[in-house]
C-alpha cells in the first residue's frame, strides 16, 4: 500500500483580544463634561449674536412699516385738500387727542392706500415686537394700532388752558422734519388728552389705569417716520418729551413713561410755553 501524505495546513485561530486591549467606544465622564462645556461656551458666544441679528431684522421691518405709513399719508394729502388723515375721534370733538386708534373713516381711507388695518402678524400698523396689535374694539368701534400717529390733528389742548387751538395740519404748511408716526408708547392720566375728572365715555378708558414709573434703564431709541416720507432710527438721547399741560400745571399726556420731579416739570413747562 502506498502511503499518502497530506500536507499539513496550519490554521491560525483568531482569538479575541484581551479585555484590557479592546478598542474603546465610549466617552469617559470627564470627556463628556468637556464636550458639554465646549458646547455651552459656543452657545454663549453665538446666541447673543443671533438675538442681535433677530432684533435688527425686527427694527428693519418696523422701519419699513413706518416708511409705508409716511408715504401713504403723502399720497393721501394731495387728493384731500392737502390734509393728512385725522388723528381724532369719530365724534368730531374739538379737544380729543387720539393717536393710537383708527376709526372706521380712517380705516376705509387707509385701505384705499393699500395700508389695510387687520389683526395679523404682518400688519403694517404695528412693530414686530408688538404682534398683538392692531386690536379691534367693536364697542367704540375702533382699531388700536401699535404706533403713535401724529398726523392730521385738527385741534389740540393749549398749554395755558383747556381750549382748542388751531393746528397747521396741511401738508404744505408742515416741515419735512416733523414726526408723523413713531414706535413709542405714550402715558396718560386716565384720559386721552383731556384733564383729569372728565367723564365722557368716549374719552375715558375705565379699564386703563395710570401708568407707573418706568423701571430700569432707558431704551436705546426707536424708529420714527417724518412728514417728508422718510424714516430712520432715532437714538433715545436725541428724543424729547412731548407733554400736554393743563392750566393748573398738571400733565395730561406724556411722551415718555417717566415720572419727573416737580422742579423738572416746572422747567419743562416753561420751555413748552417759550419755544
State each model region's role.
Residues 1-29:
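N-terminal leader/signal peptides at the extreme start of proteins
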Residues 24-64:
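Amphipathic alpha-helical segments typified by the pilin-like N-terminal helix
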Residues 19, 30, 36, 46, ...:
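Generic alpha-helix initiation/capping and coil-helix boundary signal
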Residues 4, 37, 44, 48-52, ...:
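Residue-level signal for well-ordered alpha-helical scaffold segments within enzymatic catalytic domains
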Residues 3, 12-15, 44, 124, ...:
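Generic N-terminal simple sequence motifs
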Residues 6-11, 19-20, 52-55, 63, ...:
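General helical secondary-structure elements
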Residues 60-275:
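Short, well-structured segments within or immediately adjacent to enzyme catalytic domains
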Residues 7, 16, 35-42, 47-51, ...:
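N-terminal cationic amphipathic segment used for targeting or macromolecule association
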